[in-house]
Amino acid sequence: TRFAAPELATTKSTMLSALTSMTTPAWAFATSSTSFPTAQAPVNTPLRLRILWNAKASAKAEAQALPALEGPLQLCLSKTPLPAQDPLLSHKTTHRPWYQDAAALLEKHPQLFDVIFLDTQSRVCEGSRSNIYIQDEQGHWWTPPAQGWLLPGVQRQALLNSGLARETELFLDDLLHARAIRVSNALRGWQNALLVQNPV
């Protein structure tokens, strides 16, 4: 579920105020008052359901076929760091200016699954559509802490709750020398990945 920025929300403070004032989860509105679309896809084809919910408690649902993936998933690094401690980074909204270049790159190079972002201190943050994990030499999986510079995904939290992953600060050097890399999101689960050279 993604929060849709209201038409009148022209500033970050307005958006944050709308986000923090909500007491009813998006799915409550979506399941009670939203008619879900029918995607044009063969029977038994996995679908992606996207629910947009705004501060006026209006919900919109979109559905489309979810194509299969072949692993390991290919990742590349963003050339632009994420802004330091932007409060909107930890919310799932349609206000995503820092990911626009990544979206264009992924559309141009469909062999890539995601673009991984660092902050201005070369700390690993997240992908534009996934959380990231690295495995150390002891076989432990680590993911960056959710301290204002990443979206704490549902799948990520499930992995933390189960003890399969732990939080710690990760830097570019950790990523480059990781024993293994994985990414996760609620659509795709926890997937093996590899870092490849940025396409020209």
Per-range role (PLM):
Residues 1-4, 26-48, 52-200:
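Helix-start/capping segments and mature chain N-termini
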Residues 3-11:
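Extreme N-terminal basic, low-complexity initiation segments
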Residues 10-25, 31-35:
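Intrinsically disordered, low-complexity segments enriched in small polar residues
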